[in-house]
Amino acid sequence: MDFLRILLFVLACIMALFTSAIAGGCIQRYGKCSTENSNCCAPSECYFSFNQCF
């Protein structure tokens, strides 16, 4: 496999992990940036490039 295929495979695995962790519209571990759901953080606490709390 060349480097690009390996990179795409790793990215696909990461995206699968993130999508499987979604419950109630928010990421369970960190929470998405939102003020509408109590499981989410305020926008000021977000890491905006991923729209998630860290």
From Swiss-Prot:
Lineage: Eukaryota, Metazoa, Ecdysozoa, Arthropoda, Hexapoda
Function text: Binds reversibly and blocks P/Q-type voltage-gated calcium channels (Cav).
Protein name in UniProt: U-reduvitoxin-Pr7a
Keywords: Calcium channel impairing toxin, Disulfide bond, Ion channel impairing toxin, Knottin, Neurotoxin, Secreted, Signal, Toxin, Voltage-gated calcium channel impairing toxin
Any GO MF annotation of the entry: calcium channel regulator activity
GO cellular component terms listed in the entry, alphabetical order: extracellular region
Source taxon at top rank: Eukaryota
Entry's transmembrane regions: none
Cystine pairs: 26-41, 33-46, 40-53
KW Disulfide bond (keyword) present: yes
Stretch forming the signal peptide: 1-23
Domain commentary: The presence of a 'disulfide through disulfide knot' structurally defines this protein as a knottin.
Species per Swiss-Prot/TrEMBL record: Platymeris rhadamanthus
Tissues showing expression: Expressed by the venom gland.
Cell location: Secreted
Family to which the UniProt record says this protein belongs: Belongs to the venom Ptu1-like knottin family.
